[in-house]
Amino acid sequence: GSGNIIAGNAVLIRNFVQDIGQAHIMDVGIKAALGYNPRSTVDWKGNRPSTRMGAVAILRENFIKARKLQKLLETEKKVIDEVDPLTDLFMDILSNRLKMMVHVHKEDDIMVLLQLIKEFGIKVIANHCVDVHREEVFTALKASSVPVIYGPMDSFPYKVELKHESWRNAEQLLNSGAKFSIMSDHPVILQR
């Protein structure tokens, strides 16, 4: 989940079906995370950042590698069989075949996310954003065509990056005109 910088596929499903094969509606994108979570899970395997900048650096490295490989494939200096699965995934994100569903709370992390969008031309959906307390940040997301899946509303501010979390922040989102939906994040987060 959100402890990984790149966590896996995000899909849209039907919750109540007779046959689990009917549950899958469509692939939505790839789950990614910025901020506190990826740097807080130090016991997990793989390349782990110890700072927010470190998490962004790992994302950028993967995008740069994928962009270089795309160019080599276009010039036939590489064949698709030589591409590892993670780089192939990042090439799908770069070509906008997949969106990134990014776990992000803080305004500064959102600004970094907007820079990644500008640098690599990727499509993103911002998940959470509950620490955003200024309308300008939601307006910047709207200007970059980033929809928001907002929430959970009125959850306990259980980590430092949620110090501005308030159900009142939803007004800033609404006033910005950004596209959004509301999430419960159930059963991960207890509500007040």
What residue spans do the PLM features occupy?
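Short, surface-exposed, polar/charged, turn-prone segments marking secondary-structure boundaries
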Residues: 23-26, 41-42, 129-131, 153-155, ...
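Long, well-ordered mid-to-C-terminal structural blocks that present hydrophobic/aromatic surfaces
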Residues: 119, 125-128, 132-134, 138, ...
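Active-site-proximal beta-strand/loop segments in catalytic clefts of secreted hydrolases
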Residues: 1, 103-105, 128-130, 151-153, ...
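Short secondary-structure capping/turn micro-motifs that flank functional sites
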Residues: 3-6, 133-134, 157-158, 189-191
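Polyanionic/metal-chelating signatures
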Residues: 1-124, 133
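Short, surface-exposed linear patches
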Residues: 17-20, 122-126, 147-150, 170-173
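His/Asp/Glu-enriched, well-ordered alpha-helical/loop segment
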Residues: 99, 139-192
